[in-house]
Amino acid sequence: MSGSIDIASIGRGSEIAVVGTGPTGLVAALALGKVGTSVIALGPAPQNPASAPVETRTAALFASSVDLLKRLEVWDGLKSEAAPVKVIRIIDASKSLLRAPDIEFKASDLGLGAFGYNISNAALVAVLYARASKVLPQVIEANVEAIAIDRSKVLLALSDGAEVTARLLVGADGRRSICRKSAGISTSERPYDQAAIASSFRHGRLHQGVSTELHKENGSVTTVPLPDPHASSLIWVGPRSEIAQLTQLDAGLFEEELNARLGGLLGPISGLGARAEFPVTGLSADTLAANRTALVGEAAHILPPIGAQGLNLGFRDAAALADCVAVALRRDRDPGGDDVLASYRRARGLDILTRTLGVDLLNRSLLSQFLPLQAARGLVSHGLKALPPLRRLVMRLGLTPPSELPSLMRPGAG
């Protein structure tokens, strides 16, 4: 038990309580609501754009994540804010003796119009929250301050003084998850001594739907198209000391540094957006589900910002959990029972493990000065460049999990 709750005073209840109103939590609440059970979403409402700090962070969503948003009936409100990513370009700008060749992955090689879409985090959360407020029984604008779990239910005390109960608790409350702590789930962390800057900028040349990952010895710069053809979002990863210095530069000097790092790839740079600095870490929950609690998104796993895996992984968590609960409902079973939690662990384990290991290995290989590792990375890159079938296979593996997609994410699903 975390905190103290008067069980006798609880008045509001639901089959499922989802804690966290970020993108993954809202998607989880909507997906679970769609399978026919009562869901309460708990967390703060999005800030009013007029009073909130400028938010320039974006999310690159794969096609399967977009399909999920369509099933949840929110994509129509988002597509005008989204930019298609048609090409992913990887550039090795290191000074390695065994430098890897530049590679372009094209969605058209898979018969796709785009790998996915890049969209503002603020727009994504606003549309999801509006939909949740419309279709869910309750969306409570309060934080969870204490949680107690017994054999048949989960009890939550909220910051507004209210108390609620549910049979399944979904923890979508991020890296410092109170849900994870209350369920007694420990974590393993992977420090990288890196930080990142998220921002946006304007550029003289058209981006043409191309996302570029430019890798150097100590980090990377990734640009992702925005709806304006002369604007892109930015993730700059580097040593903590370097990122701290870059954050302190005025806009003009930062633009000069960015232009130098990109080598004029997108033409003259201007119109730098607000910059947000965040640590680059890796985190894995030691189990995805226990004690009537299922973890999704960053409560379960945190990855370095490479390959746009993080949020897409969280969306697959949410959709897979909805599948597991749907099976339980058809069989008239407890949605928070041990069999449902075990089913969720099986459904998500391999996908999360392969993505976590893959991103960790790639990040460490980019930082390593060990010549055999550099040689291996260069050899793989040469193979990808020279062998189209291998390149197509890698693209498919990057976009979809090794196991079957959850039902709400399958193309053509109802």
Regions found by a protein language model. Give the residues of each.
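N-terminal FAD cofactor-binding segment of flavoenzymes
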Residues: 55-94
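Conserved FAD-binding catalytic core of PHBH/FMO-like flavoproteins
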Residues: 69, 162-163, 168-267, 273-275, ...
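C-terminal helical "tail/cap" subdomain of flavin- and related membrane-associated enzymes
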Residues: 323-414
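Conserved Rossmann-like nucleotide-cofactor binding loop
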Residues: 24, 47, 176
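FAD/FMN-dependent oxidoreductases across multiple families
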Residues: 244-329, 333-336
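Conserved N-terminal helical subregion
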Residues: 5, 9-13, 81-182, 190-195
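Glycine-rich FAD pyrophosphate-binding loop
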Residues: 33-56
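N-terminal Rossmann-like FAD-binding beta1-loop-alpha1 element of flavoenzymes
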Residues: 15-41
